[in-house]
């Protein structure tokens, strides 16, 4: 400093070193109880009770310290204007009661079973937060050792679910199978007039292989069962009190008579008629077993319709100054399929198996009141839906190339006919986008599906063609098994510190980020960089095809090698079994992303998210299983 003293520079590392740590204590209490009564043969009455309390106490101290800002002559600055000590205590109580009866009966070739019961769940959350400013002593912060203002807050939330349920099963000779289920549930999250819903389901199966007319296939057909099912379930995944026009007190920034007054926020618009989402699923499938069940195949095709999806309702005029209330505003449809194939066999003393499964699905919005077809997210970060929209779609710009010096005249101005991002003046090395509407400006129009400007759908972040491969072999006590898992297709938009070079002033440069534009290196992958990510960084990092990543991958989930000692070696020692094993988890992943990015854990976000997530750990295990 100018006075000869020294201070740490304001870096993230020094903020951690000089700042006070946050302490958190957690407790988890869980009680379970179960009673089973058998009044008479074939009938069991079961009562189950669960209580779970999770509590936490967090102590946080924002202490005040001085640092050198490192920008303008290393001026001395304070981390905060006033120190603050804060204690937050909260507890969540969950209780569940289930009382149900099971009845089974067999008469000849007829098998019958029935279940009926009652269910009730309750959830209660209570939190108290107290804070005070200006601590006398940084080493002994407490609410009583402050000289500044107090702040006290309290939060409370609860909801209840109560319902009846049943299940009926019938089969004849193991060939004709029938099942029906149903629930009648009520939730306090919904208005009293629309609190309850009935959710039935039914399924049937036919074991064709057991029919006499299939006797000709006994030499190779072990099992053939056709299945069909349809069912409804209810979804109440919405915050409580959405139908209550509540007001919240707050302290505004203005001062009246020397102090901040207490003000009330006006209540939000509410709906008194929204209710459960109803999710109905239609499924067709078959189970196939061949060659004494050495080869097995299971296939399912399904269509899932969500009716009355809970979402903000129709658009309201901007002059109203309020958001649309929660309503059953949308319908969506998912279609998908899944296939699983397994082979088990033995060759001499070697037994082995190999399995493969593959599934895929897509989801489309079938109905939503969004006449202007707004794109993106609202102020609360919730996605705008629109009719015909595929969930997961990525809107962005098609990248043409990077600007070159030939795109500018001798005065540094763009030549006629070459577009630029609206509001920015490009330089050589910046990103040049495709101007679809030929107006000379790259923009998102009105940011709607009706007028997206130069934006187009450039990808979809839904995981497609997810698959798994498993296999193993055993020979005289020695066995080896493996599990592979992967995704066949996925687009990922990644724009964070781990992907983009010089993300902010304290970013680390990784070796995967060194291919950036310079006047001497014009055929680079990354564009021109700007100090502290200013300049045209925002224009260069708009969602685009150039940096859209391929999220497909194959991961080696597990490899296990084991050896079981012969029983004749163990009998003299009084042991029944001794197995030695070595196992590896999450060993390798083959993907298309830059080094350091995990296709399963990577944060896909715009500039503003640092992108750090904890990856799946690679683990090695060695152990002995002994049975006496």
Task: Enumerate the language-model features and the residues they cover.
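Extracellular/periplasmic, surface-exposed regions of secreted and cell-surface proteins
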Residues: 3-62, 73-392, 539, 543-628
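Intrinsically disordered, low-complexity regions of eukaryotic proteins
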Residues: 5, 289, 340, 411, ...
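Extracytoplasmic gating/loop element in the C-terminal half of outer-membrane beta-barrel translocons
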Residues: 14, 67-70, 187, 426, ...
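A structural signal for short, well-ordered beta-strand segments and their strand-loop junctions
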Residues: 46, 65, 481-483
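Short, positively charged
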Residues: 143, 445-448, 536-537
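Conserved small-residue
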Residues: 242, 344-461, 501, 511, ...
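Aromatic-residue-lined binding/catalytic grooves and analogous aromatic/hydrophobic interfacial grooves
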Residues: 405, 469, 626
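Glycine-rich, aromatic-lined ligand/substrate-binding cores of catalytic
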Residues: 460-495
